[in-house]
Every structure is written in structure tokens, then in C-alpha cells.
Amino acid sequence: MDIVITGPESSGKSTLAAWLSQRLGLPLQQEEARSYLGGQSGYLPSDLIRIQERQSQREMALADAPGAILDTDILTLMIWWREKYGPLPILFNDAWHRRSPRVYLLCRPDIPWEPDPLRE
């Protein structure tokens, strides 16, 4: 079963995901949005769709593992899209219904904010 680390920006998700991966001996899927948008100064709706596609491909590559630690997943992209653009494209809903069984750990922003070019 996969464990998804989710929550608002600067709440320790990536740190917790890396720690759990090491502690439990499960593969870590890092946040796809961070990899994809790393050098960009902005993004478009098409970028979020591409991030979802890449994230889904990476999740499928882990399908044979007994479980994985995911530093965010489709849920984060769905919330992001709704906040920025409104109603979700059907492909996000389809991806939500196709996902594997998961446990969600929700982080809260009770640690100091760390500025980052990708944070809004």
C-alpha cells in the first residue's frame, strides 16, 4: 500500500517522505511538480496536466513494489487546479479513480516558513 504525504507548502512533506522511505525501506516518489517546474518562472494549465501525466507514469513504474512513499499525488494537483483554474478537467477525475489504495498523511504548517521560488 502506498503512503502519500500531503499538506500545504512548507509543512515538511518532502522531509517526512524521505525519512519514511528510508525508515520503512520503501521507494520514494519525489514531488513531480518540483522536478518539472524547477527552472521555470511560471506555469500554465498545460503544465499541470503534464505534471499529472508524468506523476502517473512514475507511479505505474512503482506498481510492482509492495508499497511506496509518495511526496504528494493527484489530490494535491486537483486542489491546486481548483484553486487556480476552477472546475477540474476530466482526466484528473479519471486519474483519481484509477489510483492504487493509499494512506494519506496530512502535514500541517506548524514549522517556520522557508522561502522557495516554487512556493506561492
Regions found by a protein language model. Give the residues of each.
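Walker A (P-loop) ATP-phosphate-binding motif of ABC ATPase nucleotide-binding domains
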Residues: 2
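Hydrophobic anchor at the beta1->P-loop junction of P-loop NTPases
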Residues: 5
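The conserved Walker
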Residues: 9
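A glycine- and Lys/Arg-enriched "phosphate-lid" helix/loop adjacent to the NTP-binding pocket
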Residues: 85-120
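Conserved lysine of the Walker
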Residues: 13
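A basic- and aromatic-enriched beta-loop-alpha substructure that forms the phosphate/nucleotide-
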Residues: 66-83
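Conserved substrate/cofactor phosphate-moiety recognition/catalytic segment
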Residues: 18-60
